[in-house]
Amino acid sequence: MLVRGHWQTGRVPERDLLVLTEEPLNAETRLDRQRGRIVPAGRHYVRTHFAIPVGPPEVLIKGAARAPRSVTLEEIRRLPPRTVTVTLECAGNGRRFLDPPVPGEQWGLGAVGTAEWTGASFHSLLPGDWLHGAVEILFRGADEGVPKDLGRRIAYERSLPIDIARGDDTLVAYAMNGEGIPREHGGPLRLIVPSWYGMASVKWLAEIRLLDRPFDGFFQQDRYVIEGAPLRNIEPRAVITSPADGADVYGRSLEVRGYAWSGHAPVERVDLSEGGGTLASTTLPADTAPHAWREFSLRVALDPGEHVLIAQAIDRKGNTQPLSPRRNALGYANNGARATRIRVRG
């Protein structure tokens, strides 16, 4: 089916994506269709807050004491290009499993995906002296609407600290997996903030503003916060993609596969357990893509019968995925380990 004409990559591939809502468009990747390190645009999850706009081909930049200037897509393309492999995860990924339920899109575990993003490092768009006196940089998208509990029309906008915005891998991107960014993924220009939850990677980028005080807008103070603190780095998580939850498997030797990621540091180990006892562990080798998920594979021998498998991610800084969810009012950063239940038939 077509989702109101927005799906630039063609018809919504229902075998790959589960559409939660059509307007605004929210769709997650089916776990059994997560294959390979790089997720094609048509299989990558989509998160929108309002109707999908036609993104502008230029970005307006405003400084406190500077005359506004516009930078066009073609001008950005002429800047030194940089390609970064980035895992983006919606902050609400896993919300569906909270009990009692909390408000928000009821994502399973498919609101995550990895792509190769190409663009210009943000810091190359403006001279360094523009940042004098700035404490944050605000990024506004072309998408606008009325949040249910706000009652007035606003644009989607988020700010970044100066040090994060100036990182080499923070991009104003114009390509996804080597092609122009599809409309549903924020093209033609999108901010990419590696290692942070996806809310920071503002889509349909329309305006950049240098601020002399912290931003306190709706999507910074009322949404994407836990106990008043705006969300930042992605928490560690491992997800089993094979075997599927509820599957019957044949033979006692079983390969367990999946993905693991963290926005604090690359994942270095995945533990597989059952009933509190470790079945197997794998140490992942060093990787040249620090902002991307890691594929893992573990082989275990299981007796016939029912089994409950749990995968846990541990990153290089020692951050460990919790076994239980950490509850908060809107169900953000719920990275509690999820059980995969299978039946082994000998």
Describe the predicted segments one by one.
Residues 2-346:
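Structured, non-membrane catalytic/scaffold regions adjacent to prosthetic-group chemistry
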